Amino acid sequence: MKILAIGGCGSMGRYAMRSIQNYSAIEEIIIADINKETAEVFADSLNHKVSAIRLDVNDASALKQAMEDIDIVVNTCGPYFKFGAPILSAAISSGCNYIDICDDWEPTIDMMKLDAKAKSAGVSATIGLGASPGLTNLMALIAIRELDEVTTVYTGWDIGGTS
């Protein structure tokens, strides 16, 4: 499996790539960032399966070229109101499965409108698979399954502030 990690040397992308780099199913991880030097430094800190490329996600042809022969696009490049739908559209057009950590509701709606296009292309697209939304939603689902009745679920997270 080949993974293109767009924004893969940002804080969330770094964590994700460190976490998956040693999975046996992964043949190659390509860290894609507008700053190739930063991407190379990070890629060099990981194992031999990881390389780096310069990618400007505003360049549609470069985006499409980067997705050639890719199985999964992991998009941790924000802001999602600007980059979410265009990167997902490129992944669908390229036949790449897609995962992101989008945490904004408006681009989520825009990306959900691409569902029929993704299904038609045989592409699986998972949006909002970060900490919140993502992990918090899965934890809520686990809790819901243990209860007889649920009327409302609220999720949130603490970023280290004081109350």
List where the protein language model places each region.
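N-terminal Rossmann NAD(P)H-binding glycine-rich loop of SDR-like oxidoreductase domains
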Residues: 4-19
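Helix N-cap at the beta1-alpha1 junction of Rossmann-like dinucleotide-binding domains, i.e.
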Residues: 10, 34-37
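Short beta-strand element of Class I
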Residues: 28-30
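Short, conserved SAM-binding/catalytic segment
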Residues: 42-50
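Conserved Rossmann-fold cofactor-binding substructure of NAD(P)-dependent oxidoreductases
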Residues: 54-70, 76-79
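ADP-ribose/adenylate-binding Rossmann-like module
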Residues: 79, 90-108
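Rossmann-fold NAD(P)-binding glycine/threonine-rich loop
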Residues: 101-124
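Conserved anion/nucleotide-ligand pocket segment
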Residues: 130-132, 136-163
